[in-house]
Amino acid sequence: MGEGAWWAVAAVVAALAVVALDAAVRAAHAWYWTASLGAGRRGRLPPGDMGWPLVGGMWAFLRAFKSGRPDSFIDSFARRFGRAGLYRAFMFSSPTIMATTPEACKQVLMDDDAFVTGWPKATVALIGPKSFVNMGYDEHRRLRKLTAAPINGFDALTSYLGFIDDTVVTTLRGWSERGGDGHFEFLTELRRMTFRIIVQIFMGGADERTAAELERTYTELNYGMRAMAIDLPGFAYHKAIRARRRLVAALQRVLDERRARGGKTAAGAAAPVDMMDRLIAVEDEGGRRLQDDEIIDVLVMYLNAGHESSGHITMWATVFLQENPEILAKAKAEQEAIMRSIPPGQKGLTLRDFRKMAYLSQVVDETLRFVNISFVSFRQATRDVFVNGYLIPKGWKVQLWYRSVHMDPQVYPDPKKFDPSRWEGPPPRAGTFLPFGLGTRLCPGNDLAKLEISVFLHHFLLGYKLTRKNPNCRVRYLPHPRPVDNCLAKITRLSSSHG
């Protein structure tokens, strides 16, 4: 046998050794987490792969999302193990069951006895231990009851609508009048606009400097939300946790100032009541008021939910409308009809006008499905539970893969096509449309978010055009889907503009 042949044999043996070592390490890691279940219960687990110790499936997860093919992660499990609906993995340093079908997601989300919130350590630390993401059922119900009406109630939305409408009109006009070549980062500026709106709603008295500081700090915090909780220089979580400390300090200063003024402005007049004032004053049935750390964590949570999703979905909806002339024309015709129905003397939009936006609502829903801002959420089993015939052991984490549901061709035919008409007819069955979750932990700011998005699209459709500088720009999927150039574009005011 020649020297070349020996080298070939050695290479094959080495490759086989690597494969054997990989299989042995994976098997040992799986045994470590499942041995205590016993043979009977272990045999009822969903199929899957626990990966290597410490990292588990995180490398494959990050590789899929950072390569621009986010669906390939769950697709790899489906190819290897079939369409089981549940898969076993090791994610975010925990043994995890991943739910990927409407039926599995619905059962987990609707069972508050068997499942509690189970977000990763990084998310809990950054949003806050006293926020919804870390609360038990009773405390969550109490806080949701205290905060829901001031966010999504009819009176609340009515009071917010005027400011949202004025802000959108002023912002669009300003963008269309920019100097130079007119290009700017559309997503970045949208996020600033939605942040101004949410700060006004929650902290109406915050000055411009404080609002700008909050926006910069929050942006740093957000990039660590889906990272592993490694608090070392160079890691996203390390930078984010430091931003969290600065954000808490800034909110505490505003809170201290509010308490000191006792509902008065600096000049001594009665101050308008905003969400922070309501959180300071609100009492539950037992007469208990919220502590400062509870108020701050609630504010951070709503800054995240109300600002991040609105900015990104508004950008993508605008892009999809501009890329689909027939859809744009239909949405524009609806908004023109609404304008013609507004009585003389009415200033701005009303909730009555908003509720006439049937087709625009379909556009927003299709954008929510297509983009998947919240691609996954987290629960933890409080006891052994069987879902789809598989065991979810007590203490294990559960990931609810909303993205897999929304991009499943068995649920949505041709899922990679942007098609608002799929929302015509009866509402989707429970578990198939999950942009805001489901059950008692449905996102409390969903109506406010849709109101913001719809008001922006209303004015954009009636008077403006978006032209992207890099229309084929690559998309980055973590922490949220966005073009790598933040949608560098210019806004042009049309001659037929109504504003």
From Swiss-Prot:
<dbReference type="GO" id="GO:0016125">
    <property type="term" value="P:sterol metabolic process"/>
</dbReference>
<dbReference type="GO" id="GO:0016132">
    <property type="term" value="P:brassinosteroid biosynthetic process"/>
</dbReference>
<comment type="function">
    <text>Catalyzes three successive oxidations of ent-kaurenoic acid giving gibberellin 12 (GA12), a key step in gibberellins (GAs) biosynthesis. GAs, which are involved many processes, including stem elongation, play a central role in plant development.</text>
</comment>
<keyword id="KW-0503">Monooxygenase</keyword>
<dbReference type="InterPro" id="IPR002401">
    <property type="entry name" value="Cyt_P450_E_grp-I"/>
</dbReference>
<keyword id="KW-0560">Oxidoreductase</keyword>
<dbReference type="GO" id="GO:0005789">
    <property type="term" value="C:endoplasmic reticulum membrane"/>
</dbReference>
<keyword id="KW-0812">Transmembrane</keyword>
<keyword id="KW-1133">Transmembrane helix</keyword>
<comment type="pathway">
    <text>Plant hormone biosynthesis; gibberellin biosynthesis.</text>
</comment>
<dbReference type="InterPro" id="IPR017972">
    <property type="entry name" value="Cyt_P450_CS"/>
</dbReference>
<keyword id="KW-0349">Heme</keyword>
<comment type="similarity">
    <text>Belongs to the cytochrome P450 family.</text>
</comment>
<keyword id="KW-0408">Iron</keyword>
<dbReference type="InterPro" id="IPR036396">
    <property type="entry name" value="Cyt_P450_sf"/>
</dbReference>
<dbReference type="Pfam" id="PF00067">
    <property type="entry name" value="p450"/>
</dbReference>
<keyword id="KW-0479">Metal-binding</keyword>
<keyword id="KW-0256">Endoplasmic reticulum</keyword>
<protein>
    <recommendedName>
        <fullName>Ent-kaurenoic acid oxidase 1</fullName>
        <ecNumber>1.14.14.107</ecNumber>
    </recommendedName>
</protein>
<dbReference type="GO" id="GO:0009686">
    <property type="term" value="P:gibberellin biosynthetic process"/>
</dbReference>
<feature type="binding site" description="axial binding residue">
    <location>
        <position position="443"/>
    </location>
    <ligand>
        <name>heme</name>
    </ligand>
</feature>
<feature type="transmembrane region" description="Helical">
    <location>
        <begin position="5"/>
        <end position="25"/>
    </location>
</feature>
<dbReference type="GO" id="GO:0005506">
    <property type="term" value="F:iron ion binding"/>
</dbReference>
<keyword id="KW-0472">Membrane</keyword>
<dbReference type="GO" id="GO:0051777">
    <property type="term" value="F:ent-kaurenoic acid monooxygenase activity"/>
</dbReference>
<dbReference type="GO" id="GO:0020037">
    <property type="term" value="F:heme binding"/>
</dbReference>
<dbReference type="GO" id="GO:0010268">
    <property type="term" value="P:brassinosteroid homeostasis"/>
</dbReference>
<dbReference type="InterPro" id="IPR001128">
    <property type="entry name" value="Cyt_P450"/>
</dbReference>
